[in-house]
């Protein structure tokens, strides 16, 4: 399970899903 961390520059993958600007996805 990975997440998409949204930045102004673009998207970056992350394994952690803390509450905030991160959107979790089951598959990536």
From Swiss-Prot:
The keyword Disulfide bond applies. Keywords: Acetylcholine receptor inhibiting toxin, Disulfide bond, Ion channel impairing toxin, Neurotoxin, Postsynaptic neurotoxin, Secreted, Toxin. GO terms for molecular function: acetylcholine receptor inhibitor activity; ion channel regulator activity; toxin activity. Expressed by the venom gland. It is found in: Secreted. Disulfide bonds join 3-24. Its main location: secreted. One of its GO terms (cellular component) is extracellular region. Transmembrane segments: none annotated. The keyword Nucleus does not apply. Belongs to the three-finger toxin family. Short-chain subfamily. Binds and may inhibit nicotinic acetylcholine receptors (nAChR). This is Nicotinic acetylcholine receptor-binding protein Mnn-3C. It comes from Micrurus nigrocinctus.
